[in-house]
């Protein structure tokens, strides 16, 4: 068995990636989220495949086909809710995975980090297009509002929006192409994940101390396969409780009303995992400025290696920056809350304050805190 594992051209790749991979001996449960994201992706592709067998991407029948899946298909309701709540679990794991990377300075592995940012954009695009497919009120108006933001681009904006729509409004052509992209993107994401892992295995994993761990490595299997299995059990438990007991808790009731271009919902808002970015978008009165802030709210992650001023990699031994980090986490929670609120006093000013705080912490306060810590510890 050992000979096959180490000599077979295909199996040896798996062996070097998941079995004999040298891993730091001290990585904590925060390093579980990579494998959990892989599990989420597998769940989404499988459930999505079964949904696609019964779904029709036509404005006249899309809503009815989703109803048909829930009522008439064997375990269709389960597959549909697993897919919908699987997206939420996916984003929870994604945010925790990125948060771990920021906390422990994993962004210094630049290729891996940048590939991760591309993956984040790809997953967000996939989730957005998936939300349009049930063709409920929030699907239609969400698609209209978000795609319309591209009209803020000078000169080509309006043409670009009509090109994406395939007409003069969100209609049949839009739904069909969104379904096509929503179907193909997860497979592109899977390929990008392999590139992400390829870059990661060039350098090896980071660890909670932020120090070089070459002198103290252990094989990935059995130590971290068993550890990941615990994470899988916890994730599946939370996932099934959410899916079976509270399937609609994260959804919007408006999406149970068929799409109607003639009536606008009282509050147009995206799914909860986009609310922080939506709040940043809305906090700027100018349309183009808002769109740029929206893109920058994610793209700012790419600047983190350039903004790293500390002589230490992780925040483990850096209490000042730690404080900034947890204020940033609280700020993101405030932005998520604000994104779901109507545009009126006092939510407008809270959203603007939280948006300024978000960019200030990442671009100004954390780099300054790093320099202060260097001086305190005489590291310069």
From Swiss-Prot:
Q: Where are the transmembrane segments?
A: 33-53, 77-98, 113-133, 178-198, 226-246, 288-308, 320-340, 347-367
Annotated GO molecular function terms are:
metal ion binding; ubiquinol-cytochrome-c reductase activity
- Give yes or no: UniProt keyword Transport: yes
Taxonomic source organism = Microtus duodecimcostatus (Mediterranean pine vole)
**Subunit field text:** The cytochrome bc1 complex contains 11 subunits: 3 respiratory subunits (MT-CYB, CYC1 and UQCRFS1), 2 core proteins (UQCRC1 and UQCRC2) and 6 low-molecular weight proteins (UQCRH/QCR6, UQCRB/QCR7, UQCRQ/QCR8, UQCR10/QCR9, UQCR11/QCR10 and a cleavage product of UQCRFS1). This cytochrome bc1 complex then forms a dimer.
- Gene Ontology terms describing biological process: mitochondrial electron transport, ubiquinol to cytochrome c
For this UniProt record, give its keywords in alphabetical order, as a comma-separated list. Answer: Electron transport, Heme, Iron, Membrane, Metal-binding, Mitochondrion, Mitochondrion inner membrane, Respiratory chain, Transmembrane, Transmembrane helix, Transport, Ubiquinone
Q: What does this protein do?
A: Component of the ubiquinol-cytochrome c reductase complex (complex III or cytochrome b-c1 complex) that is part of the mitochondrial respiratory chain. The b-c1 complex mediates electron transfer from ubiquinol to cytochrome c. Contributes to the generation of a proton gradient across the mitochondrial membrane that is then used for ATP synthesis.
- Mind telling me which SUPFAM superfamilies this protein's record contains? a domain/subunit of cytochrome bc1 complex (Ubiquinol-cytochrome c reductase), Transmembrane di-heme cytochromes
Cell location: Mitochondrion inner membrane
Q: What is its main location?
A: mitochondrion
Q: What Gene Ontology cellular-component terms does the record carry?
A: mitochondrial inner membrane; respiratory chain complex III
State the protein's name.
Cytochrome b
**Which residues are involved in binding heme b b566?**
97, 196
**What cofactor is this protein dependent on?**
heme b
Give any extra note attached to this record.
Heme 1 (or BL or b562) is low-potential and absorbs at about 562 nm, and heme 2 (or BH or b566) is high-potential and absorbs at about 566 nm.
Encoded by which gene?
MT-CYB
Q: Which residues does the annotation say bind heme b b562? A: 83, 182
Q: How is the cofactor bound?
A: Binds 2 heme b groups non-covalently.
Instruction: List ligand-binding residues for a ubiquinone.
Output: 201
Q: Does the keyword Transmembrane helix apply?
A: yes
Pfam families in the record: Cytochrom_B_C, Cytochrome_B
Instruction: Provide the membrane topology annotation.
Output: Multi-pass membrane protein
